[in-house]
Amino acid sequence: MRLVTLLSGLVSLVSVFGLELDLDDYASLQNATALVAYGLMDYYTGDQYGKTVGMFSDPYYWWQAGGAWGCMLDYWYFMQNDTYNDKIMAALLHQTGDNNDYVPLNQSTTEGNDDQAFWGIAVMQAAERKFPNPPDDKPQWLYLTQAVFNTMALRWDSETCGGGLRWQIFVWNSGYDYKNTVSNGALFHIAARLARYTGNQSYVDWAERVYDWMEDVHLIDNGTYRYVYDGVSINDNCTTVTKYQWTYNQGLMLSGSAYLFNMTGSDLWHERTHAFLNASRVFFNNSILYEAACQGPNTCNTDQRSFKAYFARFLGSTAELVPETRQQIMTWLNTSALAAAKSCSGGTDGHTCGLNWFRDDWDGMYGLGEQMAALEVMVNTQALKRAPPYNATNGGNSTGDGAAGTKPHPTNLAPLHITGGSRAGAGIITAIIGISIIACALWLVY
């Protein structure tokens, strides 16, 4: 490894055992992230005999697999490296389930709304980044995203707390009485991205509906600093807020608002984007990203150790979509990427990544979440150097169906009977649960 001066190390380069990263040198970034991506894929077991395509080794749950494939999509796009594209394609298609809505039978009794959502976010990402389309006889990326959105929207529960999604789909699962932010924030987030991709106003209406409910029950603050909290219980009519703050929840609301501003040009969504960005400062110390709720006391569980990955991804997309956020976000991403690179100096391979990026070396922590977080923060330093998310009017070529996911299904709260010709975008779902169909009928079918 070459020696570097203190000044250059502070600005753009870090050199450590096993991993060298120079943010001013794209080849250096490609080489460094290739090592991190390889370490991430070390946890993938779907190619092994008797294992399930798309799944990672224990103890990593199904939802985190969806998050990991989203991470690998970012790696492909920003690093222009298609090494793992066949695995990404196979995983995203294998886990769709019989109804192509990411409720596969092997997960259907334990799956929560948030679990399903992270696969929906991954396929939305595939559509927006123009990842190679599936074969013609397979569901397309936009279709799969719409199916996830529609099945989640059907579970909107107006009978308790005036609305909102429950955490769990089935009554027998722990957490059924909890309406958590990640489920509702993900519904908002997916609606916002579908709105921008399709131009369909009914998705905007849905995003506004979810946002207003979350604000009404105080899951999100209203002001110039909009902090995002964990959830509420229906047992006290959603009056007591669990005030844990997680990076991925903040990111869902931040980037969802950015998508809506980019689509609508609305001052309201511009203001909200900046308010969520202001509140995001709680997750940085000297511009280095950390999971504030658990990292200090060293109590982060397996899931929580991956949250920074999604937040870094959502920061990158926000910077792409809202120019005024770029200076702050890129300062955070660049500083955090260099810090993360220092942590990727552990293990027998010399480039296993850790959890704590404040150190100048590996902290002894390792796992899928650590690799994901380091990879996402590194590749998103390039967020402004590639084309922003595509949509149906600027080069996006994924096809869908506004009625996707509305086939009668045991996970839906009520069976639906919709003919094949009923394809008026997301307005179908809006109409089913009481929103006007008049405006929705004017939109194109995707």
Curated annotation (Swiss-Prot):
Record lipid sites (GPI-anchor amidated serine): 422
Main location: secreted
A single BP term in Gene Ontology: budding cell bud growth
Subcellular location: Secreted, Cell wall; Cell membrane
InterPro entries hit by this protein: 6-hairpin_glycosidase_sf (IPR008928), Glyco_hydro_76 (IPR005198), Mannan-1_6-alpha_mannosidase (IPR014480)
Enzyme Commission number: 3.2.1.101
Alphabetical list of Gene3D superfamilies matching this protein: 1.50.10.20
Membrane topology: Lipid-anchor; GPI-anchor
Role: Required for normal synthesis of the cell wall.
Official protein name in the record: Mannan endo-1,6-alpha-mannosidase DCW1
Phylogenetic lineage: Eukaryota, Fungi, Dikarya, Ascomycota, Saccharomycotina
